[in-house]
Structure formats: structure tokens, C-alpha cells
């Protein structure tokens, strides 16, 4: 969700990160937040669940979604003068009702 990811970028800002992009899109898909933590580029998926009837927010980032995020991230790196040796990680910000959980290194980028 556009508004959720823009507002949740503040979670990173409060931790001293620089938010590089919100709702970044390319031909491979979208990444909700791209931020920089020191030298590390953080690619973050935001998931929101109002109730647990469809499962918790963290459970919504399955293998196929991870692969898509990785493809978008690789293209981002390539088109921004970066390469595969650039330190990066994949995070998930999960919002269940009013509970916000930041899961750093939620999955590996080698899939």
C-alpha cells in the first residue's frame, strides 16, 4: 500500500537510515522501500494485515514474492551504478493491526 510504505519509511529514518525510494517500480515489479543503512542497501517489503484471518503479515512474503523482490533489487543495483558486491539485505516490515515488526535480513538474495 502506497501510504503505508511512505509512512513506514519513517521507521528507518528514526534508526538513522537514509530512505532512497518508496514504491520503486521497474519492469520486474516493485519494492516498497529502498533505504541505506551505512554502506548497506536495504530492500524492504511492507505487509499489512488488519486481522489474522488471512494469516499474519510476515507470512505473506512467500518464495515467489521473494524472487520477484530480488529481481527488482538486482535491476535497481545495476541501473544505479552499483553491482552484486554492493552490501544489501532484504527486510520485511510487517504490520498486524497496530503492531509493527521490522525483520532485518528476512530472506537471502541468492535465490
Language-model segment annotations:
Residues 13-27:
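A short acidic/basic microdomain associated with nuclease active sites
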Residues 1-9:
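Single conserved hydrophobic/aromatic residue that forms the stacking wall/gate
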Residues 53-82:
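Mid-chain, well-packed structural core segment of small domains
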Residues 79-111:
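Domain-level recognition of nuclease-like catalytic cores that cleave nucleotide substrates
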Residues 31-57, 69:
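Conserved catalytic cores of phosphodiester-cleaving nucleases, focusing on short active-site segments
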Residues 26-28, 37-39, 96:
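A generic beta-sheet turn/junction motif
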Residues 28, 41-43, 87, 100:
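Structural motif
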